[in-house]
UniProtKB/Swiss-Prot annotation:
Family listed: Belongs to the ABC transporter superfamily. CcmA exporter (TC 3.A.1.107) family.
Source organism (scientific name): Haemophilus ducreyi (strain 35000HP / ATCC 700724)
Main location: membrane
Protein name (Swiss-Prot/TrEMBL): Cytochrome c biogenesis ATP-binding export protein CcmA
Cited function: Part of the ABC transporter complex CcmAB involved in the biogenesis of c-type cytochromes; once thought to export heme, this seems not to be the case, but its exact role is uncertain. Responsible for energy coupling to the transport system.
Membrane topology: Peripheral membrane protein
Length: 210
């Protein structure tokens, strides 16, 4: 099994003229998952966007297998699943059609059983045929979350993945992340909830606040 590593090297992040954090450094290797903690406004979402290559730090760099993510964008994005605050789905398509489109875009097997299983895990089977524009914001986010049961990407970066699901769904997702990491995957996430798992490592951004 090929081992991957994401290294966060002395990152600094600003919002406007306000420096949120600096000197942020840690690493995540295959088999590990890390919860990013910190008080509101410290820059947790900003950090995840930097790790996903969607924003630039004012200092420092992010390395994937010893090379800057910006020097190997195609290779990095091929291994990255990012869930931000926006669902990133097509509102004119149904939940089922969105997941089928995702399977095609990722070159996955067009497996109906896997697709229905993913919808079941986020409690959307009964709404699978509705255009996503008819779904609530929380339900649309669950459509995006269902992709986690389809993706083969190794690195998951998830911003508040538990907000749109009930307690049973939270338990299912935690077990799914644990299984993903046990098979050589890795995950970095934020959450206001306490994650009941002895396998998760926590990192507080507060320690990097000026």
């Amino acid at each position: 099994m090929h081992l991957n590593q994401l290294v966060i090297s002395h990152l600094a992040c600003e919002r406007g003229e306000n420096r949120l954090f600096e000197g942020c450094h840690f690493s995540v290797s295959s088999g590990e998952w890390v919860q990013i903690e910190g008080h509101n406004g410290i820059g947790k979402t900003s950090l995840l966007r930097i790790l996903a290559g969607l924003a630039l730090p004012v200092a420092g760099e992010v390395l994937w297998n010893n090379l800057s993510i910006h020097k190997q964008r195609d290779e990095y994005y091929a291994e990255l699943f990012y869930l931000g605050h926006y669902a990133g789905i097509k509102p004119e398509l149904s939940a089922w059609e969105n997941l089928r489109f995702y399977q095609k875009m990722q070159g996955l097997s067009l497996d109906d059983e896997a697709l229905w299983f993913a919808l079941d895990k986020v409690s959307l089977v009964e709404r699978a045929d509705l255009p996503c524009s008819y779904l609530s914001a929380g339900q649309q986010r669950r459509v995006a979350l269902a992709k986690l049961w389809l993706t083969q990407q190794k690195l998951w970066i998830l911003d508040e993945p538990f907000t749109a699901i009930d307690n049973h769904g939270v338990g299912d997702l935690i077990m799914h992340i644990e299984r993903h990491c046990s098979l050589g995957g890795m995950a970095i996430f934020t959450s206001h909830q306490t994650v009941e798992s002895n396998k998760v490592r926590t990192l507080s951004l507060d320690q990097f606040k000026l």
